[in-house]
């Protein structure tokens, strides 16, 4: 191997650590044999990508270079397979890319499940130098993160369940207290008004969605909080619970605005604008507070970090991938 290739070593390793797949792609394109480079601890680039959770570099190696089959049997000085490495807790800088302990644990589980697909069946229970299987390593390394994730999930569910319970109380009371009173026949006085129809539909919609959201949040509080629950089950419940909370809040404010319009705006039409403005205020507050969390949950749960992403289409090695087959 030439001196020029060795000059790429530090750049390649640093690019893997930083998950800068463009640099890795450029180096591999110009010098394919650099794929065999190792750092001072003896880890090659796929091992480093797994240890440091560099998903873009991992995807580049896996889907473009077609190199991964030869990595299945690689072990480090402690007899750790690549699945053992995936079971280790990610470095703090990698964990901090994701907000919230529960989502961090979800990302760790996604990595473990991804590498599990890559290894051979017998490697799932293969033991390292310390007589530990990959599953045992994962559980041991993530005990603290699991506790933090449980606290984070419960705290989030509790705060949201309080809001949902308040909405249920308010809209239920509004449903049995008909604005304007009833006729002798028992029918509402305003039943012919469009605003009353909007109120009735919005209030009922708010009641149903807030009650559904409350049940979802309660199901989180009573969950077992096993490792697998953090992968899909708990995040999915929180996603749908937050969606129900957004919808119920919006519907409640629409119902409240419709009643104000019904009562005041026949003779004071100028009040319509301030009513709409103030009705939007609580909606904007809850959106500002909770939408970033909802977006993070949806991206983490439904948008996989592994696979052939669009950014790989422009990689130079994509047009040169056959040269790596014999390495």
Language-model features: locations:
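Acidic, Ser/Thr- and Pro/Gly-rich low-complexity regulatory segments
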Residues: 1-165, 176-188, 217-230, 264-269, ...
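Transmembrane alpha-helices of multi-pass eukaryotic membrane proteins
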Residues: 10, 43-44, 154-164, 194-208, ...
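C-terminal substrate/ligand-recognition segments
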Residues: 15-17, 21, 55, 198, ...
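A broadly tuned "polar low-complexity/structure-edge" signature
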Residues: 81, 251-252, 258-260, 264-265
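Helical transmembrane-bundle signal
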Residues: 165-171, 210-217, 252-255, 259, ...
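Cys/His-rich Zn2+-coordinating "finger/knuckle" modules used by eukaryotic regulatory proteins
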Residues: 191
């Amino acid at each position: 191997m030439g001196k020029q290739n060795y000059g790429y070593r530090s750049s390649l390793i640093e690019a893997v650590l930083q998950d800068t797949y463009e640099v890795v792609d450029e180096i591999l394109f110009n010098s394919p044999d650099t794929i065999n480079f190792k750092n001072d601890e003896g880890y090659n680039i796929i091992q480093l990508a797994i240890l440091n959770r560099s998903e873009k570099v991992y995807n580049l190696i896996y889907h473009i270079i077609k190199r991964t089959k030869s990595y299945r049997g690689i072990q480090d000085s402690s007899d750790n397979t690549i699945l053992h490495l995936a079971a280790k807790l990610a470095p703090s800088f990698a964990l901090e890319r994701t907000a919230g302990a529960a989502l961090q644990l979800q990302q760790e589980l996604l990595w473990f499940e991804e590498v599990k697909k890559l290894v051979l069946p017998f490697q799932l229970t293969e033991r390292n130098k310390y007589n530990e299987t990959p599953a045992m390593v994962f559980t041991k390394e993530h005990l603290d993160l699991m506790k933090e994730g449980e606290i984070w999930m419960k705290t989030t569910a509790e705060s949201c369940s309080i809001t949902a319970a308040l909405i249920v109380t308010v809209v239920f009371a509004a449903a049995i207290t008909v604005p304007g009173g009833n006729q002798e026949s028992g029918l509402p006085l305003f039943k012919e008004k469009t605003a009353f129809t909007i109120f009735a539909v919005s209030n009922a919609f708010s009641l149903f969605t807030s009650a559904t959201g409350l049940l979802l949040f309660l199901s989180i509080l009573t969950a077992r909080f096993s490792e697998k629950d953090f992968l899909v089950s708990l995040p999915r419940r929180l996603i749908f619970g937050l969606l129900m909370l957004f919808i119920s809040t919006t519907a409640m404010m629409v119902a409240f605005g419709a009643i104000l319009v019904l009562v005041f705006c026949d003779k004071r039409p100028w009040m319509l604008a301030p009513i709409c403005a103030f009705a939007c205020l609580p909606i904007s507050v809850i959106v500002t507070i909770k939408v970033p969390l909802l977006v993070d949950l949806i991206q983490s749960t439904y948008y996989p970090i592994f696979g052939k992403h669009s950014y790989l289409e422009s990689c130079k090695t994509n047009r040169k991938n056959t040269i790596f087959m014999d390495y």
